[in-house]
């Protein structure tokens, strides 16, 4: 093999390894959790007002986890194990324009009717902790979302965190739209 051919083969192999590493990281199949140069950034905060009382909103959020997961959510959620008010669940989120699916494994803890907490076990970053706080306001509920996302490897990890956080927050906002619609449907006067 000539020197040029060897260099080309080395570049091709490096590109292949980098592509595989990117795929495994993005999809959550491999989590790099070294703690080296760990940086933590906030997720949120943001809020949404739902025209339904906190117990109804809580039940809408908790039902797919604590009860039977609806068939319509099968492509988004799989509960691995249930134990009282805590579950271990996989969440699936389309990324890269739907070409890939990011999978996260998270514990989800329920404190009826005011708090749902999420903690990442495995995913595209080594650390995520987040919560939904439900506060009654008249006949409505304010859902407040807060959290934090941590990555390793200093500036490189910070760059990755910016990309992951944008997709993460977009997924939460999208889920809030569904929560709002279903909770308000359940609380509509025609349902009483």
What are these language model-derived features?
Residues 4, 49, 65-71, 75-124, ...:
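Glycine-rich portal/gate segments that line the openings of hydrophobic small-molecule binding cavities
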Residues 52-54, 111, 137-139:
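Short loop segments at secondary-structure junctions
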